[in-house]
């Protein structure tokens, strides 16, 4: 009787242990996932960065998911809550803007989920590492290239317009300030035709902003658009106004369409961040932390200032680190 009772009890203990181990295994399996919270996958830049994170996560045997915030801080917060509820191993965060990032960081910190920030930056909060491009120097190089193009045409004293990303973002502020310094350093001394901040980050939005700027400033001779896809809208507006060749356009980041546009001179320069490389660096910092290491608090990835004059030389690098091997 006692022997049987002991056997049953022992069997129960073995079963409980087995169930416990299964529970641990399941929880561990659930946690072997990296989530990337992105502002909006409609912009190629974020898609390329996402691919970089995914490539390293898969190398490490982890699952990966990108959650699109559709440029909404509220949606990004909800995405963060969903990821945290699933008990993910770590979050790579590109905030919708720097002022809303602390709310996401606070949620993750409460559940002890590590966060690596990729690109935009935060006003406050705890994080493992911040992977950033040197937006100021990149934009300064773009400003210098546009100034050179204006000087060649004899337009160095004419006005230049800016269509920017959100100036609530630290990277947006750096691009604006760097570009202004670059224009000045390059000898462009004209006034600023105006500054419009993007809201939807679409080519259609930039088309309208450019139309309005050209109408209000008929003497405008240059334009800086602070991200890639929207720059196509600016070119369309210049063409619609029959001002082709009269308003040189400089841009930031890069999409495959830029290759031919740079070669033709329709875009004179673009400060190309390397989003695929940034995504890889973000994931590498995360795994260093998960494996007990201590990554650098800030990791800077250089920006490639690509111009009509150097595009052929730098194109092999651009295809990999900028376009995530989507271009052959």
Feature annotation, model-predicted:
Residues 27-328:
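A residue-level marker of the well-folded mature domains of exported/periplasmic proteins
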Residues 3, 22-24, 36:
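A detector of low-complexity, intrinsically disordered, Ser/Thr/Gly/Pro/Ala-rich segments
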Residues 16-27:
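C-terminal segment of classical bacterial N-terminal signal peptides
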Residues 3-10:
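N-terminal export leaders
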Residues 1-2, 30:
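Generic N-terminal leader/processing signal
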């Amino acid at each position: 009787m006692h022997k049987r009772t002991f056997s049953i009890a022992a069997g129960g203990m073995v079963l409980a242990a087995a169930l416990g181990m299964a529970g641990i295994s399941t929880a561990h399996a659930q946690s072997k996932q990296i989530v990337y919270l992105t502002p909006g996958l409609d912009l190629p830049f974020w898609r390329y960065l996402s691919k970089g994170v995914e490539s390293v996560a898969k190398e490490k045997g982890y699952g990966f998911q990108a959650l699109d915030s559709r440029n909404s801080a509220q949606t990004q917060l909800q995405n963060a809550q969903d990821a945290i509820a699933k008990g993910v191993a770590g979050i790579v965060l590109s905030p919708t803007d720097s002022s809303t990032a602390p709310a996401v960081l606070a949620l993750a910190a409460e559940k002890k989920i590590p966060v690596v920030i990729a690109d935009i930056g935060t006003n406050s909060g705890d994080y493992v590492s911040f992977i950033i491009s040197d937006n100021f120097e990149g934009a300064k190089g773009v400003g210098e290239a546009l100034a050179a193009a204006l000087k060649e045409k004899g337009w160095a004293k004419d006005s230049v317009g800016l269509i920017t990303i959100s100036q609530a973002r630290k990277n947006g502020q750096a691009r604006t300030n760097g570009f202004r310094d670059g224009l000045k350093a390059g000898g462009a001394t004209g006034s600023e035709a105006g500054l419009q901040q993007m809201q939807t980050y679409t080519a259609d939005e930039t088309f309208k902003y450019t139309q309005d700027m050209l109408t209000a400033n008929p003497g405008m001779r240059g334009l800086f658009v602070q991200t890639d896809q929207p720059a196509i809208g600016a070119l369309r507006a210049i063409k619609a106004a029959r001002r082709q060749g009269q308003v040189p356009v400089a841009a930031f980041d890069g999409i495959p369409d830029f290759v031919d546009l740079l070669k033709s001179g329709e875009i004179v320069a673009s400060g190309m961040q390397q989003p695929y490389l940034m995504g890889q660096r973000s994931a590498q910092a995360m795994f260093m932390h998960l494996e007990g290491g201590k990554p650098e608090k800030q990791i800077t990835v250089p920006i490639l200032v690509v111009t009509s004059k150097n595009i052929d030389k730098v194109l092999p690098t651009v295809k990999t680190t900028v376009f995530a091997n989507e271009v052959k």
